[in-house]
Curated annotation (Swiss-Prot):
Domain of life, per lineage: Bacteria
Protein name (Swiss-Prot/TrEMBL): Photosystem II reaction center Psb28 protein
Biological process (GO), any one: photosynthesis
UniProt source species: Prochlorococcus marinus (strain NATL2A)
Pfam hit, one: Psb28
The gene coding this protein: psb28
Organism ancestry: Bacteria, Bacillati, Cyanobacteriota, Cyanophyceae, Synechococcales
Residue ranges the record marks as coiled coil: none
Keyword Cell membrane tagged: no
Membrane topology: Peripheral membrane protein
NCBIfam families per UniProt: PS_II_psb28
């Protein structure tokens, strides 16, 4: 299992870094200002059947601070959380650049371990 740098993390439960590595897809409008990143976690570790109702945000944490989104969809089976899909939106070039700095740090933290 890949160890994630503690300074860069994704959290659904405050204080608990998600260990599952997401699939991430980026979408941008033609004008380049608005867009979104769609995260899919196929085996989330921090979201369980006992705490999934309390999960309300995805937090993207790095040295600059915290980005967050409330757009979270869960796929649940009888005995576990199967998939988490979360969407982070940006509405300006500055917000996109900030997101990309987080994404770069997150990717680098995974490749260093």
């Amino acid at each position: 299992m890949t160890k994630i740098n503690e300074n860069v993390a994704i959290q659904f439960v405050k204080g608990e870094n998600e260990k599952d590595q997401p699939e991430i897809r980026l979408f941008r409008n033609l004008d380049g200002k608005k867009g979104k990143a769609v995260y899919k976690f196929y085996k989330p570790k921090t979201i369980t059947l006992t705490n999934y109702k309390s999960v309300q945000r995805m937090f993207l944490i790095d040295s600059e601070g915290v980005l967050s989104t409330k757009k979270i969809d869960l796929s649940i089976s009888e005995d576990h959380v199967k998939e988490v899909k979360s969407t982070y939106n940006w509405n300006s070039e500055e917000e996109f650049e900030r997101f990309m700095r987080f994404a770069s740090r997150y990717a680098n933290s995974l490749s260093q371990n």
